[in-house]
């Protein structure tokens, strides 16, 4: 059976404003400079730890700010976040396929957001004992959980392309997220989707190719 695995931030949900607010709330609490939306956009994608490493001034400890960020974001992750226009309709069109969401966002925030927007879809975020993407571990765990032996992976960043490559699954890269096409292309082979309305047909075609052994 073939399934579909989705990244969360920048793929299904536009989380950037809530992430920026949480970063800047944390920076203010520690007396550090604020960051622009464009800066935070570049920082995200490799987990909360890396986000805070890039956010604090070079050479400063990031562990204490990380704990503060996670605490604040967990309580404020739903203020400005919403699905990208057309995402809910695309998921409905794909409802016959087993689906899962795998994210480098902290697991508590992933489960909170997915319970609100994508109830019934298995979702996993970063948690102790499971390497974050681009390790293939999250993909393999999700595939086992939803009972599929093949899948197509959908994401918006170079991390997602590398994750799919490491898991030996085909990748569909969306262009409405946190990275531009050139950054994604530099990471490796992928197909590109320009709008959520195009996603069901593109995924259907990729699944057909996968099922036919192409």
What are the roles of these predicted feature ranges?
Residues 191-195:
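Short acidic-hydrophobic, aromatic-tinged amphipathic segments that line or gate anion-handling sites
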Residues 1-6, 201-204, 209-214:
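Non-catalytic pre-domain segments flanking phosphatase-related domains
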Residues 95-97, 145-149, 206, 210:
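Glycine-rich phosphate-binding loop signature in dinucleotide/nucleotide-binding domains
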Residues 75-101, 107-114, 136:
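Short, acidic loop-to-helix structural element flanking the phosphoryl-transfer center
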Residues 42-75, 93:
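A metal-dependent, Asp-based hydrolase signature
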Residues 79, 106-154, 158-167, 181-183:
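Substrate-recognition "cap/lid" segment bordering the active-site pocket of phosphatases
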Residues 1-42:
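Active-site neighborhood of HAD-like aspartate-dependent phosphohydrolases
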